[in-house]
Structure formats: C-alpha cells, structure tokens
Amino acid sequence: MQMVSIKNQGCVTQIIGPVLDIEFPNGQLPKVFNALKVKGPENIITCEVQQLLGDNRVRAVAMSSTEGLKRGIEVTDTGAPITVPVGIPTLGRIFNVLGEPVDNLGDIQSEDSLPIHRAAPSFTQLETKPSIFETGIKVVDLLAPYRKGGKIGLFGGAGVGKTVLIMELINNIAKAHGGVSVFGGVGERTREGNDLYEEMKESKVINADNLKESKVALVYGQMNEPPGARMRVGLTALTMAEYFRDINKQDVLLFIDNIFRFVQAGSEVSALLGRMPSAVGYQPTLATEMGTLQERITSTTDGSITSIQAVYVPADDLTDPAPATTFAHLDATTVLSRSLAAKGIYPAVDPLGSTSTMLQPSIVGSQHYSTAQQIKSTLQRYKELQDIIAILGLDELSEDDRLTVARARKIERFLSQPFFVAEVFTGSPGKYVSLEDSIKGFNMILGGELDDLPEQAFYLVGNIDEAISKAEKLK
C-alpha cells in the first residue's frame, strides 16, 4: 500500500511586517529553514522558519510581500527547505529567490532541483593545491591573479566598468574553460538588473534564439523585495552554481552583486526577529552568516566555484563590520580606478591598488613574480614623478627618470585590452591574452627592447606582436 504523506497544517497568530508567527499542532513543529506556504488573498506566499518560539509556535520570514494576510490564515509546512531548479535549463533565464522564472519566457523544464540550505564540502573533497585561474585579461592575470575556487572582491564606483569586466569574465570562462556562470543580483537596482540582461543578450553571453547555448543563469532579489528574499537570493544563486560544479563537473564563475546587501538584509531580518544588535547595529550572527555562504564557495576534486563579489564600502570606511567581515574571506581584490577610466584605459583596473594572495614566487613562479614586481615599481615611480612633471615639465627630469616615465606610460597603455563583449561599441575585435604572452610582452617593455616604439602602439592591443605591427602602421 502506498504511503500518503500528510502535510503539517498551522495557522498565523501574529504578523509584524515580513515576519509571521505561526502555531502548529502539538508535536508537528517544522524544522528551522523549512519552507512554509501561506495562502494569501491573491497568491501563495513562501516563508522560511527562522526561530522556534516554544508553545508550538515558530517565527518565519516571508520571501514576498505579506500584504492582505491576516491572523488565522492556514499555513502548510512543505517539510523541506526552499528548493530551486538547477542544471542546463536554467541557462539564459532570470529567477527570483524561490527559483521561479521572472522573464516571461514560460516555465523551466528542469528535472533536477536542490534545497538552498546545504552543507559545505567536507575536507576530504577539497582541492587544496593552489592554482591560477586564467582570465585572459592581462592586468588581472599578471598583477592580481585569481585563485581557482577563490573569492575576489571587486571594488569600484559607478561608471568605471564593473559590468563590462563582469561580462568579459563570463565570456572568457565559457570560451577558455568550457565553464558557465551564475549571476546573483543581491539587493540590485531593478534597472541595473534589466540593463545587464539586455547587454548580455546584445553581446551573445545570453543566446536569445537558443537559450541552452547561453553561458549564464541570472538570479535577482531586487532592492524593493522584502529582506527575507534579499538575504536568501545569494544562496539560490550559489545552489545553482554548486550543481554545475558537483554534477556537471565544470568550472563555475559565481558573481554576487552586492555582497554588502546580503549583510544589510541579514541585519534587517535580525532586527525583525528581535535579536539584540551587535557592533554598529549589525546582526550578532554576522560572521556566521557570512561564513555559511562563503565556505560553500570552493574548489573540490570535481570542479571549482570561483566567486567575484562586488563590495560596497559604506562611507568608504574599510573598518565597517560588513566589508571587514568580507575581507577575511577574499583571496584577491580588483580595484577599479576612476582616473584610469577618465584616461580611456579599459579595463580600468588599478595596478597598484589591486592585490592577490596568489602573487608569490612559490605559486606563480619566479619569472611571473619578478615581472609583476618590476611593473609595480615602475608604475609607482611614475606616480611619484607626476607632481614634478606637472610643475616643471618632463624635460627637467634626469635621463633615467625620463626613461622610467616613457616605459611606465607604455606599460599603462599595454595594460589596456579590447574586450569581446565591447566589440559592439568599440569596433575593435576582442582579445584573449595568455599569461605566457603577457609576461613576454611586459618583459620586452621593461628590458628596453621597445623603447623606440610610440606609446599609442600599445593602446588597446592583445599581445606584444600586435603592438609591434601597430607601430609599423603608425610610422
């Protein structure tokens, strides 16, 4: 005889904004993190159990608006956490926190689904040997290389090229690593999310004609959504990425924009649940919540999840608990500079401000390390000389300093690169530059082999051979 599972039924006893208190029959309390379904006046609202209050009551946080709900409404325990679709059918689509498509392209035909709350991989599954994740972007690979399965913080204000850099990384991982990407918009502006989607379609990162050939799945929890949705949308994106790593055994890029909004939403939920706030009004569980998310982003023997997280720094205060807690998990930082963007040097990655724990001779090799250090010291010297040049002019510098400035300006321009996703706007074909070619090119500039070439020959080219042939044309 087939067993028929009877769902636990409860009823709402109190509503405080997005927080609901729900009473269940004796001995039938749902577990913490279980998804509950509440039948609202217009649609079914999903909540997640956050606390057990005693007296057969639980406190849950709603994932959508609680407008129209009243006491006494029936609640059903699903018996499991929020579960989302995963796999190839998710590519090219936009989802909300519950894994429901929000792009008006119909339902998802996915046979597989996973709960958003899962344990991090065990020690025995982890890939511990540090290896470089080649992006094909010169400035990143050479000066602040990414770790495979590492976490990278992307710092940059509005209009310096964060979105274009993100799209180029999505494009390059698909071409060079055969991997896919998942984009988690956490507390995003809806307009920005829509712009990103349209730009991805334009640059063919999302193939609108054949969605399965797309390279990215998008998960959005926008600014206007309740804090519960913004707090969990990062986990939804991560769960989709984990499937590609564990089942499809692929290298995955996970973008979280913005990790600060994840903390902010957690802080709102914490206050609504009545917890005593900690430093600067943040939740007392800040480090635990951040750790639970970050520990699942890692390399296993099957594949890797490399995460790039945009970090908003409130009031530019790096000691604020939110960015400070994030820094503890980062392997590299990519800082975008407005002054480089103003010069027209794209990607506008600050070569002196960006850092990486991977830039050690024991990991990247002595040649790569010494080239990177020489580039940094040349650019640093150029930076120190800029005030003198502004006041007295270039002619007042010593012969050595003039040579340093000339090489630094060539390096600065050679760090720029035409992007595949920007072909539509620039008209220049995109270039993927291998690390080997980057090192060779910069060593030639540093060694003085190319001192007679004009500096504009180095602007927006791929490898050094292109710069040399461009110089021939400029003559």
Swiss-Prot record:
Subcellular location: Plastid, Chloroplast thylakoid membrane
GO cellular component, one term: chloroplast thylakoid membrane
Keyword Magnesium in annotation: no
InterPro entries hit by this protein: AAA+_ATPase, ATP-synt_VA_C, ATP_synth_F1_bsu, ATPase_a/bsu_AS, ATPase_alpha/beta_chains, ATPase_F1/V1/A1_a/bsu_N, ATPase_F1/V1/A1_a/bsu_N_sf, ATPase_F1/V1/A1_a/bsu_nucl-bd
Recorded topology in the membrane: Peripheral membrane protein
Chief localisation class: plastid
Reaction catalyzed: ATP + H2O + 4 H(+)(in) = ADP + phosphate + 5 H(+)(out)
GO function term, MF aspect, one: ATP binding
EC number(s) on file: 7.1.2.2
Keyword annotations: ATP synthesis, ATP-binding, CF(1), Chloroplast, Hydrogen ion transport, Ion transport, Membrane, Nucleotide-binding, Plastid, Thylakoid, Translocase, Transport
GO BP term (any one): proton motive force-driven mitochondrial ATP synthesis
Keyword ATP-binding set for record: yes
Residues that hold ATP according to the record: G156, G157, A158, G159, V160, G161, K162, T163
Gene3D superfamilies assigned to the protein according to its UniProt record, in alphabetical order: 2.40.10.170, Bovine Mitochondrial F1-atpase, Atp Synthase Beta Chain, Chain D, domain 3, P-loop containing nucleotide triphosphate hydrolases
UniProt xrefs under NCBIfam families: atpD
Family: Belongs to the ATPase alpha/beta chains family.
Subunit structure: F-type ATPases have 2 components, CF(1) - the catalytic core - and CF(0) - the membrane proton channel. CF(1) has five subunits: alpha(3), beta(3), gamma(1), delta(1), epsilon(1). CF(0) has four main subunits: a(1), b(1), b'(1) and c(9-12).
Function statement: Produces ATP from ADP in the presence of a proton gradient across the membrane. The catalytic sites are hosted primarily by the beta subunits.
Protein name: ATP synthase subunit beta, chloroplastic
Organism in which the protein naturally occurs: Gracilaria tenuistipitata var. liui
Biological classification of the source: Eukaryota, Rhodophyta, Florideophyceae, Rhodymeniophycidae, Gracilariales
